């Protein structure tokens, strides 16, 4: 697992209080990990802070899974 993926996973586990084993590339924040819309906004803000990037609103709407988040952040770095 890349450093970025490990850091994203840590944020997801801490913010959503889920088991690390459930955080896989295809895991939907809402459908699989129990997040609501506020949780997803907080995740995006945490990603921005952790990685020193800005995620525009239109891009944030496309980040639905752990894999989406990791891919977006990797490309934004």
Curated annotation (Swiss-Prot):
Q: Which PROSITE patterns match?
A: CARRIER (PS50075), PHOSPHOPANTETHEINE (PS00012)
The answer, when asked if Ribonucleoprotein is one of the entry's keywords, is no
**Pfam families, A to Z:** PP-binding
Cite the InterPro entries for this sequence.
ACP, ACP-like_sf, PKS_PP-bd, PP-bd_ACP, Ppantetheine_attach_site
Q: Which SMART domains match?
A: PKS_PP
Location relative to the cell:
Cytoplasm
Query: Carries keyword Lipid metabolism?
Result: yes
Which GO CC annotations does the UniProt entry carry?
cytosol; membrane
O-(pantetheine 4'-phosphoryl)serine modification sites are: 37
Q: Per UniProt, which keywords does this protein have? A: Cytoplasm, Fatty acid biosynthesis, Fatty acid metabolism, Lipid biosynthesis, Lipid metabolism, Phosphopantetheine, Phosphoprotein
- Biological or metabolic pathway of the protein: Lipid metabolism; fatty acid biosynthesis
PTM annotation: 4'-phosphopantetheine is transferred from CoA to a specific serine of apo-ACP by AcpS. This modification is essential for activity because fatty acids are bound in thioester linkage to the sulfhydryl of the prosthetic group.
Cite the GO molecular-function annotations of the record.
acyl binding; acyl carrier activity; phosphopantetheine binding
Describe the location of the Carrier domain by residue ranges: 2-77
Which GO biological process categories is it annotated with? lipid A biosynthetic process
Query: Could you tell me what this protein does?
Result: Carrier of the growing fatty acid chain in fatty acid biosynthesis.
Q: Which family does it belong to?
A: Belongs to the acyl carrier protein (ACP) family.
- List the PANTHER family: ACYL CARRIER PROTEIN, CARRIER DOMAIN-CONTAINING PROTEIN
What is the protein's name according to its record?
Answer: Acyl carrier protein
Organism expressing this protein natively: Jannaschia sp. (strain CCS1)
């Amino acid at each position: 697992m890349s450093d970025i993926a490990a850091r994203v996973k840590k944020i997801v586990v801490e913010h959503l209080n889920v088991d690390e084993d459930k955080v896989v590339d295809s895991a939907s924040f809402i459908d699989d990990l129990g997040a609501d819309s506020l949780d997803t906004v907080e995740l995006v803000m945490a990603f921005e802070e952790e990685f020193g990037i800005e995620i525009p609103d239109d891009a944030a709407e496309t980040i639905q899974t752990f894999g989406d988040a990791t891919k977006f952040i990797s490309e934004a770095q």
